[in-house]
A protein has these predicted regions:
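Rossmann-like dinucleotide-binding core of oxidoreductases
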Residues: 136-143, 148-178, 183-186, 270, ...
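Feature captures the FAD/FMN-dependent oxidoreductase FAD-binding
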Residues: 62-111, 119, 212-281, 418
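C-terminal, flexible cofactor-proximal segment of oxidoreductases
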Residues: 4-25, 56, 60, 349-352, ...
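C-terminal catalytic lobe of FAD-dependent flavoproteins
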Residues: 391-475, 485-506, 588-645
């Protein structure tokens, strides 16, 4: 019995239970799954006028039509069960394109069809898996070794792919468990701002019915990461409590020497044919240089290093910073503290999403494990809703006149919508509205989800301070206008060293060339964000210019990068080469295009200073590409762009 037949059997075992689940599930993915199974477009054509967008809250299917969709889905599944049929052929490219456009209210071009076929695993059970083109028994894989630095999403993805290919590897992780940033961040309210059914690997598990919320909290994400590592038996391939300090290339042996401090503080080394860094960008906290911070006598800690031994209940708490971490932590602790004083340098644009706090319905969870193609179409919708459906609106319109507040007509309309939300939430409080309104276009900085931030600001025990901080004394914070704010606890929600890629890791390539000398303090560049000339057999996940500043899922980026890296390693091994190294001209040409494209994006606006930029104002973290463009660039490894020795 195939996996498809097992799902059909599970779905139809109790037709009444199936009907109940359909009645309480997200209906458009159900409808798309029905079309996929039946090739009957009539209901989708009828429903199209009621679909205003990819988000479920932009869909208003009438009850009578919904009932017919549910009944038709039950009937088609029962027919499959009665005849014991296997999965139908994948719809044609034209049919898929039609389904996609009707399911999200248009905008999907034919270029997206191969991308979504891979992302939804319609072409193959695991669309991004890389397989050998030669008999692996002839390749002497046992003598190869890969070191992966980092045990978060990137490291786990690389390890799974290497394991599938039979290439020996070792993961070196500085923490004492898998999880990366999701292990380190545990502040109150910590969670994703990407829908969970997108914030997971496309290949595992299939489907994934486990999420309880549409935007899950930290513990659920961490459990997913660690259970994935367990499912692929990665614990035995990993050393924890390891701080990698140096990675040095030896030209004579064409191997990398990886030096690290172990859990006992002793220095060790390990040799590797290839190195993959998966250290992330948001994992090295920034401690602000505020006069007197070191003299403060109360608890003071970064949000990414939350001290759970400190009880904030009934205390006077200060949060310095108003980024994503503060946006989640502040509303979570505000009801229980004596007072909460928020020190804001610049206000953020905050978008309301009606699904943000909603649970995944029981019907949706039930169907994810039983209705064929339901999870695939749900993933498609979320990918379109969070990213590709609006990426084009983040490019500057050269004919747009008022670029101080917006960069094009769509951006201006979004600004008006966000301002309406601010005014409604702050109930006409003009002082707060002025303080909370950014002076730059939407998406100039990372767009945040409203976690009750504005409602928090309306609480009588919460104050928003927009003056700068002059100094911190033993028991208080002093603002630049001289006002004293006594506080019992200080939370530093002050971000990370996002522009200092790989810091503080020392990487030395050919002729002892230091990567830190090539990049300087914070001017990282890499081909595809993955690899750099003079550093053969060295690859990065989540490298320079790969942060998704507009939305989507970083896991999508990671999967694209890892698939590309696996192809590079495969090419090197199959050609019996020792090294693979990107040509300098290819690297340089790509980065010129990166800079040109970034200059057209909203986050390069003159009024914006964000963590994507380095100290000179160059964007080093954010990707200017749509997901489609990046997927096209990383889909196939081009040997002619590389030198092999």
């Amino acid at each position: 019995m195939t996996e498809f037949q097992k799902m059909v059997q599970a779905a139809t075992a109790d037709p009444e239970e199936l009907r109940r689940a359909l009645e309480h599930a997200e209906i458009v993915p159900v409808l798309l799954a029905y079309v996929h199974l039946s090739r009957d477009f009539s209901l989708l054509n009828e429903a199209a006028e009621f679909i205003d967008g990819a988000w479920s809250f932009k869909q208003r299917i009438p009850a009578e039509l919904r009932s017919r969709i549910c009944a038709s889905t039950v009937n088609v599944l029962l027919k499959y069960a009665e005849t014991d049929r296997d999965a139908p052929p994948t719809p044609s490219a034209d049919d898929l394109l039609n389904m996609m456009n009707l399911g999200v209210n248009g905008g999907v071009s034919e270029d997206y069809v191969p991308l979504f076929k891979q992302e939804m695993n319609l072409s193959a059970p695991d669309g991004r898996a890389v397989s050998w083109r030669r008999d692996p028994s002839d390749l002497n894989l046992a003598r190869r070794h890969v070191v992966i630095v980092g045990g978060g999403f990137g490291g786990i993805c690389a390890a799974i792919r290497l394991k599938n290919m039979g290439i020996p590897f070792t993961i070196l992780e500085k923490n004492y468990g898998f999880g990366g940033t999701w292990l380190e961040n545990s502040y109150p309210g910590c969670g994703v701002d990407t829908p969970n059914h997108l914030y997971c690997f496309a290949f595992h598990p299939k489907p994934n019915p486990a999420w309880t919320r549409q935007f899950s909290r930290r513990d659920e994400v961490l459990n997913y990461i660690q259970s994935t590592a367990k499912a692929f038996d990665l614990w035995n391939c990993t050393r924890f409590g390891i701080e990698v300090t140096d990675i040095q290339f030896d030209e004579a042996s064409a191997k990398w020497l990886v030096l690290f401090r172990n859990a006992d503080g002793c220095t060790e080394e390990i040799a590797a044919d290839f190195v993959i860094t998966a250290v992330g960008q948001l994992n090295r906290p920034v401690t602000p240089d505020i006069p007197g911070l070191d003299k403060y006598e109360g608890p003071a800690f970064h949000s990414a290093r939350w001290d759970h031994d400190v009880d904030t209940k009934g205390k006077n708490v200060a949060i310095i910073g108003t980024g994503a971490s503060a946006m989640q932590a502040g509303p979570s602790i505000a009801p229980d503290v004596q007072s909460l004083t928020v020190f804001q340098r610049t206000p953020q644009w905050i978008m309301n999403n009606p699904n943000y706090r909603k649970p995944v319905s029981e019907g949706t969870r039930w169907l994810l494990g039983r209705l064929p193609f339901f999870s695939e179409w749900l993933r498609f919708q979320l990918l379109w809703a969070t990213s590709e459906g609006f990426h084009h609106t983040l490019l500057r319109d050269p004919d747009w006149k008022d670029e101080q507040t917006a960069i094009n007509a769509t951006n201006a309309q979004l600004r008006d919508d966000l301002l309406t939300h601010i005014r409604e939430e702050l109930e006409g409080d003009e002082d707060l509205i002025a303080k909370a309104t950014p002076n730059y276009p939407p998406y100039g900085k990372r767009m945040l989800r409203d976690n009750g931030w504005y409602k928090m600001l309306m609480r009588p025990n919460v104050s928003l301070v927009t003056e700068g901080i002059a100094e911190i004394r033993e028991e208080a914070i002093v603002s630049t206008n001289g006002e004293l704010y006594p506080v019992d606890v200080i939370v530093l929600a002050t971000g990370f060293r996002a522009s200092q890629i790989l810091w503080p890791l020392n990487v030395e390539g050919r002729k002892n060339l230091r990567l830190s000398d090539v990049w300087g303090k914070d001017d990282a560049r890499a081909y595809l964000g993955i690899t750099v000339p003079e550093f053969p057999n060295f690859f990065m996940t989540y490298g320079p210019n790969t942060t998704l500043a507009h939305g989507g899922s970083v896991i999508f980026q990671i999967e694209c990068q890892v698939a590309y890296i696996m192809q590079a390693i495969r090419q090197t091994i199959e050609t019996e080469s020792r090294t693979v190294e990107v040509r300098a001209c290819v690297h340089d040409s790509f980065n010129k295009e990166v800079d040109r494209r970034c200059a057209q994006m909203v986050w390069n606006h003159s009024l914006v200073k964000n963590y994507y930029m380095n100290s000179k104002g160059r964007v080093v973290a954010a990707s200017p590409w749509s997901l489609l463009e990046y997927w096209q660039k990383t889909r196939a490894f081009a040997p002619e762009e590389y030198l092999f020795t």
